[in-house]
Every structure is written in structure tokens, then in C-alpha cells.
Amino acid sequence: MYRKALLVWLLVYGIMRCTVHSSPTALKYPALRLEDEVYDEDGNTLPDFAFDNNPIGIGNPASVFDDMYSFYYPAEKRHADDLLNKAYRNLLGQLSARKYLHTLMAKHLGAVSSSLEDDSEPLSKRHSDGIFTDSYSRYRKQMAVKKYLAAVLGKRYKQRIKNKGRRVAYL
């Protein structure tokens, strides 16, 4: 029920909005005036600054934007912007081509194991990461075992070293 009411309300709102904006009064609103002449503080008439009958948004919006761009920026700046945009597009094209080439090479070498992953790392990097992780985990296990043995056997080990007259040291 709520969705139907919302749909009807949006439909009525859209129709009302379209009729208001397409009416002749709405299009000529900026040109309408209460008085024909405007006076300043001294009583002199001011020039008429009424808007055109065609508002800016009614014509071609792209041409209005181009006119504003050419009005605010000199030709040299526009040319420099164009050169920068062209160089940036070329750079992005090269980067995407390079990424595509790496992906093709990885597929050719068999590095991509499944189509669900979008990893395009080389196989050697993944392999070296795995070796490092494995070595580091072994090292951590060895350190944990040494620490455990030092805690369990620490008292007997210290006593044996002290009896021989040497310095105290753990494994």
C-alpha cells in the first residue's frame, strides 16, 4: 500500500513540476518586472538589466558550457589543458596495456589458478612469499620451544652452570 501511495505521489509531483516549468510564465519569469523603470537614490533612471527571454538552460547546455569555458580561460590555458589531457589519456592507455600484457603472460605461464581471483602477481613472487612465511613460522616455533625449555629446565640448567663456575646462560 505504501509503495502505491508513493508511486502516485511521485507521478502527481512529476506532472505538476513539468507543467509549471513548461508554462509560458515560468519561462519568462526573469524578464517580468513590476515597474518598467528603475531609479537610483538621486532619482536617475538606471539601465534595464532584464534577462533574455530564453534562459541559459533552455538552449544547448554543452554550447553554454563551452562559451563559459572560452570566456573564463584564455586560449593558451585551454591548449595546455588539452595537451595535459591527451598525455594523461596516453599514459592511462599504456598502463592498462601493460597490465593486460602481464595478465596474458601470467595466464600463459599458468600463474592464474582460477578465474575468480583477479591476482596477476607473478608466480615467483607468490612462491618467494610462501617460502618466507614458512621459514618465519619455523623460526617462531623454534623460539617458542627454546623459551619453553628455558622455563622448564631453567633452574637445573642454572645450577649446573653455577657449579662449574661459568656465567649463567640459557639455551
Curated annotation (Swiss-Prot):
Coiled coil (residue ranges): none
Gene Ontology terms: cellular component: extracellular region; neuron projection; perikaryon
Localization, UniProt: Secreted
Secretion signal span: 1-22
Record region (Important for receptor binding): 145-153
Biological process annotations from GO: adenylate cyclase-activating G protein-coupled receptor signaling pathway; neuron projection development; neuropeptide signaling pathway; positive regulation of ERK1 and ERK2 cascade; regulation of protein localization
InterPro entries: Glucagon_GIP_secretin_VIP, VIP/GHRH-like
Propeptide: 23-76, 168-171
UniProt entry tagged with the keyword Secreted: yes
Predominant localisation class: secreted
Keyword field: Amidation, Cleavage on pair of basic residues, Hormone, Secreted, Signal
PTM sites of type Lysine amide: K164
Single annotated GO MF: type 1 vasoactive intestinal polypeptide receptor binding
Gene3D superfamilies according to UniProt: 6.10.250.590
Function field: PACAP is a neuropeptide involved in diverse array of physiological processes through activating the PACAP subfamily of class B1 G protein-coupled receptors: VIP receptor 1 (VIPR1), VIP receptor 2 (VIPR2), and PACAP type I receptor (ADCYAP1R1). Exerts neuroprotective and general cytoprotective effects due to anti-apoptotic, anti-inflammatory, and antioxidant actions.
Family stated for the protein in its record: Belongs to the glucagon family.
The protein, known as: Glucagon family neuropeptides
